[in-house]
C-alpha cells in the first residue's frame, strides 16, 4: 500500500508466492475494503499506506517493511536474465490517475 493521502492508498494484491491477484488500483479504505480477500485467510498489509489502514482493517497483519535497493536489483536482474527490456523510445510512465490542475485560492501577494 502506498499512501495517496486521506484514506486512499494505491495498492495491488499478491498471493503468498508473490503472484499478482489484482491490478494496481486506487482504493479508499474502509472496514469493508478487501473483504473477499480478507475472508480467505491471513491478510498482510505493508507499505507507506498500511499504517494508516491498520485500525480500519483490524484483522489484517501489519508488517513493517520498506523497499530496498537490494530488492529492486533482484527484480532488475530477473528481468534482464529473461530478456524483459523496455523500449525506451516508446516508454511512458504509468500514472494511475489523471492529473487535474487546480488553481490556488491563496493570494501570494
Show which residues each predicted segment covers.
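Surface "functional belts" at beta-alpha junctions
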Residues: 1-68, 95, 100-101, 105
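Acyltransferase
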Residues: 63-109
Amino acid at each position: 500500500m502506498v499512501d495517496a493521502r486521506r484514506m486512499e492508498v494505491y495498492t495491488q494484491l499478491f498471493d503468498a508466492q508473490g503472484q499478482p491477484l489484482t491490478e494496481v488500483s486506487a482504493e479508499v479504505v474502509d472496514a469493508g475494503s478487501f473483504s473477499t480477500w480478507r475472508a480467505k485467510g491471513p491478510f498482510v498489509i505493508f507499505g507507506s499506506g498500511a499504517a494508516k489502514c491498520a485500525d480500519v482493517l483490524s484483522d489484517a497483519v501489519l508488517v513493517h517493511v520498506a523497499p530496498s535497493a537490494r530488492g529492486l536489483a533482484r527484480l532488475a536482474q530477473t528481468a534482464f536474465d529473461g530478456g524483459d527490456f523496455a523500449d525506451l523510445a516508446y516508454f511512458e510512465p504509468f500514472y494511475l490517475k489523471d492529473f487535474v490542475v487546480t488553481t490556488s485560492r491563496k493570494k501570494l501577494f
